[in-house]
Amino acid sequence: MTTPVRIGVQIQPQHSPEYSHMRDALRRAEDMGVDVAFNWDHFFPLYGDPDGAHYECWTMLGAWAEQTSRIEIGALVTCNSYRNPELLADMARTVDNISDGRLILGIGSGWKEKDYDEYGYDFGTAGSRLDDLAAALPRIRARLGKLNPAPTREIPILIGGQGEKKTLKLVAQHAHIWHGFVDPESYAHKSAVLAEHCAAVGRDPSEIQHSAGVELNGGVSRGEGVKELVAKADELHAAGITLFTVGVNGPDYDLSVAEELCRWRDSIA
């Protein structure tokens, strides 16, 4: 069965002192037909003023679950280091129930050193953080199976990252969705590596939805940028990617590129 194309928007919780701007962006995204609304799990802005306005991820997801009725929601992605695995499972189960089964549990090993230092977490090394994620994922899944009440569905796990030895192995073992930032050439290679990891664990690679972050080329006119973006989406879709996510930044949260992607999605349906 062919997986339908879906469009995501990452409503980045930065540079918007008033939460109402994010609430409005979420409303507009759902109204225009966006399929998934993501935020991210950081404590400070990733670009612009490093000490600018910023909000916490999972508290916001609870509010999103109440505000929306159709769109799926999640973090792109949760940092595994910031919460005990059992607690994260309970948080995910709770937001899943509040939203009537619309949560995607996006997770990764973490990378932003300032977040770790300012909030008192051990940054470790890239390898140790991936090892921690490998240890956490079975605990998360086990706790999801014990909670009362249970999740409303098997909560889809999205794993972000492209490392061939560890990250893609974890995707093969645990994920329903794999997210990366790829061009068509590197995607073909990474997808083949993921298929090898799936074969090693006896899993059909077609069970995993492939997701990519896309963005407008700021070095050309807007019209040309949209054409380039749609052409890239066409190429990535032909290669196997079916979830396309564009990020939007506060305080304006311009959703015009997401709207173009929704039109493209509908044109190929």
Which residues make up each language-model segment?
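Active-site-adjacent structural elements that line small-molecule/cofactor binding pockets in enzymes
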Residues: 1-269
